[in-house]
Amino acid sequence: MALCALASALRSLSLASPAITARVPTLLPVGQSNVLLQLPSALALPAHRPVHMSADRSAKFVSWKSRIKYTVKPVKMRKSGGRDHTGRIRVHGIGGGHKQNYRMIDFLRFRPEKGTEPEPFEEKVVVVRYDPCRSADIALVAGGSRKRWIIATENMKAGDTILNSNHIGRMAVAAQEGDAHPLGALPVGTLINNVESEPGRGAQYIRAAGTCGVLLRKVNGTAIIQLPSKRQMQVLESCTATVGRVSNVNHNQRVIGKAGRNRWLGKRPNSGLWQRKGGWAGRKIRPLPPMKSYVKLPSAAAQS
């Protein structure tokens, strides 16, 4: 349709005039311009390069979180709207919402400053505030010549002093809420959060608002933890955890009040299609999943 309209428009022009000839658009390759539009060779249109809209990401792609140097200042971030890099919708429940700034959280609690010995150190809580990118509150702590954001615990407030340690002694420590210790240094039954799965990797478990885990027992250099889902996890004793419960305990009791507030939070409405409740609906008695282990124990064949 567009090609026919372009051909009729070009036929209506006087091609003898050099001024009009210079203004003729060049949209088609050389082979197609003379055949389809019956134009003289002087009006031959150059070939064009096709545009690839679904090109794959390069193998050298680095996330923007890795490109930017750590800072306590808010960083502007762009919303995805539930789309991936090709523009296709991957998550239908995401879209819109108020603009948000990202604050870099340091999930590795025991991180000594450069040029210092890896010894326990203290930090002071400067402020505890709301974070739009997560359900828990965050705390700005300062120690030495640096500041950083961490996940705040339930009773953490400005002016508190927290301890970060990597030492495992013969006796269990009397840790205070907000302190970070290896699991091997904590007494059995301690409530913990922000647990590492591997030493030095940073907290990956129990980071949501109001959640906490329990240190059940310690066996042969490993620690058994009960997650908020009641599932048990086995990690090395040298993995770091924070003592206490994550802040914003009443997060699950908030009242949204209206549909518009969910749109402010970037949540799109679900389909209104009625679905018959089948076997998936309702509560069931299910056995607990097996214990998840992050400990690479030697196999029986290797020991024999």
UniProtKB/Swiss-Prot annotation:
Location (main, coarse): mitochondrion
Transit peptide residue numbers: 1-60
A UniProt-annotated Pfam family: Ribosomal_L2
GO biological process: mitochondrial translation
GO cellular component: mitochondrial large ribosomal subunit; nucleoplasm
The entry's keywords: Mitochondrion, Ribonucleoprotein, Ribosomal protein, Transit peptide
Keyword Ribosomal protein among record annotations: yes
The keyword Transit peptide is assigned to this record: yes
Family: Belongs to the universal ribosomal protein uL2 family.
Assembly and oligomerization: Component of the mitochondrial ribosome large subunit (39S) which comprises a 16S rRNA and about 50 distinct proteins.
Name under which the protein is recorded: Large ribosomal subunit protein uL2m
Organism: Rattus norvegicus (Rat)
